[in-house]
Amino acid sequence: MARSVKKGPFIDDHLMKKITKLNSENQKKPFKTWSRRSTIFPDMVGHTVMVHNGKQFTPVYINENMIGHKLGEFSPTRTFRAHVAGDKKAAKK
């Protein structure tokens, strides 16, 4: 279910403080965050955010196409193991 328009997009306060501080100092150094639920704002474009996926921090470079999405969408939490090509059991009919 989508978030109500009257509430506006969500971003954690500590994350917004980090972004405004880096923008005021004109720095683009990467920083860590556990806030996967925060929405990407236009102020964040050009920054590299290290998003926690439950095990490690994944670097996410933010560009214009990511605005409006959540940070967690770009840091996968599950590892995909490719399907085995020679699996005889699955090939039976």
Swiss-Prot record:
GO terms for biological process: ribosomal small subunit assembly; translation. Signal peptide: none annotated. GO terms for cellular component: cytoplasm; small ribosomal subunit. One of its GO terms (molecular function) is rRNA binding. SUPFAM superfamilies: Ribosomal protein S19. It comes from the Bacteria. Disulfide bonds: none annotated. InterPro entries: Ribosomal_uS19, Ribosomal_uS19_bac-type, Ribosomal_uS19_CS, Ribosomal_uS19_SF. Belongs to the universal ribosomal protein uS19 family. Protein S19 forms a complex with S13 that binds strongly to the 16S ribosomal RNA. This is Small ribosomal subunit protein uS19. The lineage of its organism: Bacteria, Pseudomonadati, Spirochaetota, Spirochaetia, Leptospirales. The gene is rpsS.
